[in-house]
Amino acid sequence: MTESERALLTFEQLFDTSRAIYKKQKKILEIVLEPFDITVLQYLLMFKIHQSGSTPLSKLAMSLDLKPASVTRMTDILYKRQLMNRYDSPDDRRIVMIQLTEEGEELIEKAAVQYAKMGAGLYQKLDTSQLQYLRKLAGSLTKLAEGCSEKSGN
């Protein structure tokens, strides 16, 4: 087997594994979010805001790799449900800032706890050293992927 064939096989295995894990995690998250009546994307949007506090809408769109119009539609829905607030940036009125309401923060916290409980089963057969290695490897792969996307202009 040539070096390029080994690299391709490794890439295919990594891609298949990543996709399988993503599908399982997404399914768990969908089950958790059903009683809250929000989608996975809405949850991810709210989680990003939860992590960073008050955030410009354009920055959210970039971090989720979505078009600003899609993020605007999602924030409209969540705003109507009183899960987030929108306001103009004090530095530049053209910039729309998004912030979770107290109700939005509570929803994120409740959903995160339930997701952690259900998602733990996905990794329960791994011991502590395997989990630590997985975290380290995931971090390295994320940095590698970010470096590749910067070089390609994505």
UniProtKB/Swiss-Prot annotation:
InterPro entries (UniProt xref): HTH_MarR-typ (IPR000835), MarR/SlyA-like (IPR039422), WH-like_DNA-bd_sf (IPR036388), WH_DNA-bd_sf (IPR036390)
DNA-binding region per UniProt: 57-80
PROSITE patterns, A to Z: HTH_MARR_2 (PS50995)
Domain spans labelled HTH marR-type: 1-143
Keywords, alphabetical: DNA-binding, Transcription, Transcription regulation
GO biological process, one term: regulation of DNA-templated transcription
Annotated GO MF terms: DNA binding; DNA-binding transcription factor activity
Pfam families found in the cross-reference section: MarR
Official protein name in the record: Uncharacterized HTH-type transcriptional regulator YhbI
Organism: Bacillus subtilis (strain 168)
